[in-house]
Amino acid sequence: MSQQTTIRKLAELVNTPVDKLLVQLAEAGMKFSGPDQVVTSTEKMKLLGFLRRTHGKADTPAEAASEAAKKITLNRRKLQEVTVNAGRTKTTVNVEVRQKRTYVKSENEGSGRAAPMTPDEERADILAKLAASRQRNLDEQQRLAESDRARDEAIQRKRDEEQAAKDRVEAERKAAEEAAAAASAPAPVAAAPAPSSAPAARAPSSPSSAPRPARPAGASPASRPATPARPDDRNNAAKHKTRGSHVMVAGVEDDDATKRFAGQLHLSAADRARRSNVRGKPTGRPGSSSSRRNDGGRGSNQSNSGPHGFERPTAPVVREVAIGETITVADLAQKLALKGGDVVKALFKMGVMATITQSIDHDTAALVTEELGHKAVRADNADFEDALLAHAEDAQGETTSRPPVVTIMGHVDHGKTSLLDYIRRTKIASGEAGGITQHIGAYHVETGRGVISFLDTPGHAAFTSMRARGAKITDIVVLVVAADDGVMPQTKEAVAHAKAAGVPLIVAVNKIDKAGADPLRVKNELLAENVVAEDFGGDTQFIEVSAKVGTGVDTLLDAISLQAEVLELKAVADGRASGTVIESSLDKGRGPVATVLVQQGALKRGDYLVCGIQYGRVRALFDETGHQPASAGPSIPVQVLGLSGVPEAGDDFVVVDDERLAKDVAQQRETKRRESRLVASATNRMEDILAQMGKGEGQQVLNLVIKADVQGSVEALKQSLVALSNDDIRINVIHSGVGGITESDANSAAASKATIIGFNVRADASARKIVESNGIDLRYFSIIYDVIDQVKQVASGLLGVEIREEIIGIAQVRDVFRSSKFGAVAGCMIIEGVVKRSKPIRVLRDSVVVFEGELESLRRFKENVDEVRNGTECGIGVKAYNDVKAGDQIECFERIEVARTL
């Protein structure tokens, strides 16, 4: 390579980009302004050396040897013994200390010297450094030993102080016992000479007795000479002797135990048991009767009998009991420190029949707690709910304008969906079964005035909860009223929902293109519902539209946009999303699907979602056209996939950071809901049981299993069908759910003899097999009208027939004749209807029934006839009744069977 090698050429030779080579040259300390400058051989070698040092390689073997000479590593191993205290003994432990030190000679130090060191000088320098290091290690070990010694001395000093305090307390206690014994002993007995053994036996127990300190521990008072005494005196003397000997021997044994275990902070289990046995074992002779009698009345350790005596409470103990939403009777009794039977008795006195394992609600538990004299406080178990609330507060941000949410409400067949069809330029109503809406439809439409989100609600009476849910989450309600029909029941209900939700109302008078349209009639009828048009001086906008030809639709959109501007709708566009579930269903291919309306934040794919008692991760988002948007902002309805189950329509949803929090919140909510449901379903109160016993006689039960395509339809069907129940028949929905009819549904229906209702769903093969083998009544429906009508028919068939009595004729008794064959025969005039033979009759006297029986004989001109009509005279013989009088009325009636209906 020549002297005229440029940077560009050098880069080509080493196969390196020019920019990278310039950077490496700059890092090596050489500055070049461009790739066309010349690189000398010296600069090349300098660059090569820099690159070698950068990659950890020496430039030459000589340099590598010099690098190795700059570094020296010393290994050292040292063995020593350490003594460790282990309870009462000391243990010696061998400790091996290993040290490894590496010394590196710095370049500055080497460059500052005039000449390199000789091997002897290097060895002397290394030995000096080793000696200094060894001295530092010895100083460190000495410092640690002094620290350990000071710590041990502090511990021993603390033990001595504790032992001195114990001895001081023990001395004070013994002095107090001796003073108490002196106060309790009779003074004359202690001062007088002992004429018998009883006073002599009491003498050693006196604190003023002189021989007590010199008396040996094993001495017995029985060895003293004593005069004979009565048996009762001997017993008393034995008791007093035992008590006195106990005091002295216990003191000696306590002293021995104290000396044996003194100065030990931690004792083993065996030592603790031995110390307890020494302190607690009875004194006196082993097996003596006096010792056994003394042990039965009081503890053998007199030092513990005083301070630990039982004191009777002077006031009732009032406990503060924390009660959650529900609590079992056993748990409540444990918190009250009472027996479970006492709590059950208290509940029974309050009229609540509950077992010890049964759950009761918070109000009932609080009442029984107050009844038992304690205080009840509400337990706060909403830990995960608080964390969820904190997440929601963290998501607050800057608010921006959002599109309005408009709910279309009105009566059936007044053109709600058709009006929305025209706005969207699509055909929705033709796709609904029967031409009526049975789901909440959520759509967002981009108009020239901005984005508007529409909610289309059903108008049928069975979908009351759907309409209420739509009015709750909306900003503006558009009330559609047909100009030819006027105000109908569901129209009034929609007005009530809008007023209850506090949202503004816009009335769209539809079908004005029909011949019988009368918009003025609609305005007048809505006046009764306090909906006053602007023409009449009110604040409600009335827009005349035609969903068929499109008349007035633009005016309606202008009115919606104007109302939205007045409301100044704002929401947080970024951050965690939150909103409400509009509808939910179970798709066989996609799993649980929830239609949600985002109210705050932005909902994105991959977010963790908690929705009522369900949770999950958003796997996909779909709009009403089937497209998958990247995210959904405020006031935008979307379908969410990925939840753990089908949520309830109307549940709120919120996005959280992780799946763990979502799962914990969902499980806590499910537990609370299950406990509340158990408490609500249990018939606890006595009056409810008695009422059910009264109603149960003769009441028929129709069991149903309801499966539908969406959660809203399930809810509407349950409410509508259960409302058909009366005193004669009860509609019982044993199971309901979303999705197709499965094998478990068929088994439930077979076990309870229920009818299966499939609303827009079908049964699978296994379910159909069970239905056929068990003869289960399975019916498919797509219109809610047909469901209600057929359930009414089935329920009416269970009711059977009703026997009714119909009066067919009345005869007036004019005279009474006597017959040897029939007895009293009434001569009558038929004044109403017809009287027939062999029909039941009633005899009325002064409009009061005096006899009910059967017509035995009916004659006219001595001839038997089958019937006698109005205005004709006849003779009537009443079977088994001879007390007929003139002026009575004979009422002839017949019993007919009438089918009972709901």
Swiss-Prot record:
Q: Where in the cell is it found?
A: Cytoplasm
Q: Where is the tr-type G domain?
A: 401-570
Q: Where is this region: G4?
A: 510-513
Is GTP-binding one of the keywords?
yes
Q: What is the similarity comment for this entry?
A: Belongs to the TRAFAC class translation factor GTPase superfamily. Classic translation factor GTPase family. IF-2 subfamily.
From the UniProt record, which GO molecular function terms apply? GTP binding; GTPase activity; guanosine tetraphosphate binding; translation initiation factor activity
Query: One Pfam match, by short name?
Result: GTP_EFTU_D2
Region named G5: 546-548
Chain intervals for the UniProt region annotation (G2) = 435-439
Q: What is this protein called?
A: Translation initiation factor IF-2
Q: Name one GO cellular component term.
A: cytosol
Which CDD domains did the record assign? Answer: IF2_eIF5B, IF2_mtIF2_II, mtIF2_IVc
- SUPFAM superfamilies named among the record's database cross-references: Initiation factor IF2/eIF5b, domain 3, P-loop containing nucleoside triphosphate hydrolases, Putative DNA-binding domain, Translation proteins
Q: Where is this region: G3?
A: 456-459
* Positions of the UniProt region annotated as G1: 410-417
